[in-house]
């Protein structure tokens, strides 16, 4: 007699019949069947087996043919018995011993098991049949419900290192492996290292002992299928990527050469290096109006600003009306950037193009202290801290100049393309000149919002009062742009 039939004395009577009577009808297919081969580890979880399942009624009136029919077509089942123990009710009829798990026969193919494969089911953790089938918590994403009994092992092996058994981080060089074995194999191949074994070349390689013998570890890497050529191909791809980056940088510099931008800065640079305390003009307690002096210096700088713009690559190729629009939109920011960078060596003040030094106290006395302090803290101080050079200043000013959002442009996309070229050239310059400062390019760009905000505030407070007198700015700029380009 089978072990299943011998345990019938533990079963409770159902409907006037003993469960032993019910079980006898299944003897023909349960005898000699190894249930353990079909037990899914996820069904033993405390959360129970989730999902929608149907099972045939185990009833004495069903012979073997009745059982087979019920397995093939659940709709032909007699009225099932509802078990208060497992709470499932229809479409389940469960044989429930007082101790241990109950047994149900699912007929739903969605579980991934063959029809009629028995399952172990926890009677105290049943769920609604309308829920989706999910793996129990704790193994979700690691072990999946297999399509066949051996699927659990096939899925599990993808998540362990084939060399040492540690947790795999993915497929590396053809084999699922951990980061440690991946790095070990890559170093060995790239450096062309050779190892020797102190024992008999059959050392145990596992998670704890993988570092004891490098020879055996490397041999196991090869034996499990790691490919040396995969490492070499990876290195070649990295080399090609670096070459492409260099070519891209060179291409960007050819379109918008930073050397030309630097030449433009030097060409319009005022000769203020020889000023002394005597000719600074505005001492801290000077009665002179600092706003008037700033406006006079800005008026002078407008001439050189047009000259500077003409020297920026591709600016003169734009339509004349667009050139006027761009200068009109950015002149205040362009001048502020210039005198801010010129004032890096000055303490608590700014140095104008005329050689005059405006102290912070004078600005506060004139009622423009708030905006003056913003210039010192958000521009001058930041430029000083990062030691911004002339090339970087010129590129930032070129970015301000090529503003595609300026109203009235005939071709904003062309202006935007020129700005993108300046971005690319500046980034390539930072990488080449300051390789130890990977965030320098971003730091430079972060000065632009502050420059924009300060420029707008300066206009609001008439910081450049009477900048060009009674001459309309459009007419003034138009005359300057139509003048021949004086190369000095």
Curated annotation (Swiss-Prot):
Region described as Required for nuclear export: 374-394
Main location: nucleus
UniProt-annotated stretches for the region Modulating: 1-160
This protein's GO CC annotations: RNA polymerase II transcription regulator complex
Pfam families to which the protein is assigned, alphabetical: Hormone_recep, Nuc_recep-AF1, zf-C4
GO biological process, one term: cell differentiation
Domain of life (superkingdom): Eukaryota
Function: Receptor for retinoic acid that acts as a transcription factor. Forms homo- or heterodimers with retinoic acid receptors (rars) and binds to target response elements in response to their ligands, all-trans or 9-cis retinoic acid, to regulate gene expression in various biological processes. The rar/rxr heterodimers bind to the retinoic acid response elements (RARE) composed of tandem 5'-AGGTCA-3' sites known as DR1-DR5 to regulate transcription. The high affinity ligand for rxrs is 9-cis retinoic acid.
Entry's free-text remark on domains: Composed of three domains: a modulating N-terminal domain, a DNA-binding domain and a C-terminal ligand-binding domain.
Protein name: Retinoic acid receptor RXR-alpha
Name of the gene encoding the protein in the UniProt record: rxra
